[in-house]
């Protein structure tokens, strides 16, 4: 994160040529549990103190913020921890639940007027989906994503023929839904001949 120092081992001292009694393992594991991703562990196994008192040995361990995709198959759970091994860490933000990445549009063709011969409603659906990205360290949405399409036009359906009745539409449908305007109804009315 802008090359910020996350943590440090502090100053370690020892005799020249002696093995440095330190391990990055537990610190890295702790940071990974908090959402970081290891880029490079610059502290080599078996590192030893040098024999130059005028130079400070510096070993850099580089990590970056981990991210997690939010999809209809893998939605966030607002208020719950993003990182299961860090229950006190960042929580899923509002706007990452399934309804935020998947919205289902419907076209309902509603038939009426033919008594018990009236057909059942014809319902068609279309799913608008998108992928978001959340920073596992900060818990912020870093990419809110775009919907797979901005609108969907449903097809037309031929109106069922019922003996003794005529309908006000030969076919019905063709409605347009968007992620913000999801449900459309078209009514077909039958009248007796």
Ranges and model annotations:
Residues 6-7, 142, 190:
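Intrinsically disordered, low-complexity segments
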Residues 30, 108-110, 132, 158-159:
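Residue-level detector of beta-strand face positions
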Residues 67-69, 115, 132-134, 153, ...:
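Residues that cap or initiate secondary-structure elements
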Residues 1-2, 21, 113, 133-141, ...:
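Acidic/polar residues at beta-strand termini and the immediately following turn/coil
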Residues 20-54, 69-77, 144-177:
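Surface-exposed interfaces of beta-sheet-rich extracellular modules
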Residues 2-11, 115-136:
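Short, ordered, surface-exposed loop/turn motifs in non-cytosolic proteins
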Residues 1, 49-112, 169-193:
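Conserved "repeat-terminator" motif of extracellular CCP/Sushi domains
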